Amino acid sequence: TCVLLKNGQPVDGFMGAVPEGKLREFLDKHVPGENEVLAATDLQEAEALMESGDLETAQAKLLEALQANPENDDVRFDLVKLLISMGQLDDAETVIQPCLSQIPLKLRFEALKQWLNALHFVSTDPMGQWPLEKFDQLIATNKRDFDARFAKARVLLASDDWTGAMDELLEIIMRDKKWNDEAPRKTMVGLLELMTPVAPKGGTDHTGKSAGGIELMGKSAVQEDPQAAMVSSYRRKLSMMLN
């Protein structure tokens, strides 16, 4: 009997003797190819470069990794996220396109799509240049001015006020869940996905940094896990609005 272990756990196996060809076929299912290994190495190096602030070199590493293994969604996600943070929105749009045709669309790429939509709106629509006070005046006159509320949420998002953006989105969802093909709900779900803390590796403590690379600071920093607590709070608010 042959049992294949991964991280100390059995994942596959076979009984009796098998020909060399069958053995290679068995191993090929579980052993990453050369391109996969190179892509994983480049991804690790790129993440370290991003942590150190060397974004251009990180971008080059991620491009190299994606060329080596175009099917690696982790690399594609990190590259799109990095391009957005560097303001290279057209390049980010190009890199994300292959993932947008996936059925079903993976939530993290839907999240990046919503982020991109907001940034494109702010950079191309005249309302994207309005001061917040102008939105507030319109909303004070008509609390159901959802166009103004949604535009304000996108402006807040583009200026890195993610909680402010979600508060505005909740105001729309509370009054009309279906407005604009549920764009406020989709946007908020995307933001929550990007803000959800990264799963720890080999530990129980969160880093305070999200899977989308978003890091929020505030009065809740005294709590054990402010990022996760904040995300959970907004998830509950959204759930209450939808039920």
Q: Could you say what each language-model-derived stretch is?
A:
Residues L38-A68, F121, P126, W130-L138, ...:
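Alpha-helical segment of the N-proximal tetratricopeptide repeat
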Residues V31, L66, E93, L100-S101, ...:
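A conserved position within tetratricopeptide repeats
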Residues P70, I103-P104, N142-R144, D160, ...:
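Short coil turns that delineate tetratricopeptide repeat
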Residues T1-F14:
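A short, hydrophobic beta-strand/beta-hairpin element that forms part of a small beta-sheet core
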Residues E45, L79, K113, K152, ...:
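Structural register within alpha-helical repeat arrays
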Residues M86-T94, L107-E133, G190-N243:
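Alpha-helical linker/edge segments of TPR/alpha-solenoid repeat scaffolds
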Residues L62, I96-Q97, F135, E168-L169, ...:
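Inward-facing hydrophobic residues that define packing positions of alpha-helical scaffold repeats
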